[in-house]
Amino acid sequence: MSDNDSRFLHTLGRIADALESRNPPDPDPAALPPADAYVWNRARRRMMLVENINRVELRLLCGIEQQRDTLLSNTIAFVRGFAANNALLWGARGTGKSSLVKAIHGTVTTRGMDCALVEIHREDIEDLPFIMSFLAGLDRRFIVFTDDLTFDHGDSSYKSLKAALDGGIEGRPDNVIFYATSNRRHLMPRQMIENERSTAINPSEGVEESVSLSDRFGLWIGFHSIDQETFLDIVESYVTFFDIDTSKVDIRREALAWSVERGARSGRVAWQYIVDLAERTETNISNK
């Protein structure tokens, strides 16, 4: 082989490598290593293993007992092979929506039920139909989860979500369920819905397509602002769980002042106070 031929083949190889890096092949379901959780990496077209899931125990989520029972019952039915609904957890930020999804997954796995959690980021939602199809080829159950799911004006990716939830003529895979959290009950701002009404050939059909997106979820689970006593119950449950020494601290007064300073009472604000309290009392809360 001449030097020119060698250089030509080398150049072709580099071009092929570059094309593959930009357009990686679809993953092989059989090659997916076992794990409790994965995150979809769109750039690499593969599932990335999650070694340590960032979650709290289910019993620490106070003030959302009804929401907890509803989603837990639905999840257990799904994992056991019975009929179950896709779920939309909607409401104010910091009220425990995503924490509940992760805590319930942890609960069912500790009970010996084999189920993996797969997170797909909001910006990758167009890959949801492919992910559903990919997971359908595996002999395992999966909760596919997207946090903070909303669609703004001009964003047409919601159509991919509708297609995935409807499942086409094949239907939704029996071994996959989809949970999403959002601060919008209908996933879209009112202005976007009104804009579709004004530009549609048949205004009622345009609005119906937008609003009906949330109808693809069989469960709508609302999360609302909590009162003062519930907020304090959340704080005290963390204090007890982490065994924080509060002998020199008036936690009720401090926690309320913390919430006033941040202008909100929520599970997230309660946790932020606990992190601050643990630091001041030199309590390790990272390994619990």
State each model region's role.
Residues 2, 25, 224-288:
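C-terminal alpha-helical "lid" subdomain
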Residues 2-6, 46-70:
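Dynamic helix-loop-helix/coil hinge segments at AAA+ ATPase domain boundaries and subdomain interfaces
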Residues 66-80:
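Pre-Walker A adenine-sensing motif
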Residues 81-103:
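Walker A/P-loop nucleotide-binding motif
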Residues 107-142, 150-154:
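AAA+/P-loop NTPase substrate/partner-engagement loops
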Residues 109-110, 137, 153-200:
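Conserved catalytic/switch belt of AAA+ P-loop NTPases
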Residues 182, 198-211, 218-230:
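Conserved AAA+ ATPase "SRH/arginine-finger" region at the nucleotide-binding site
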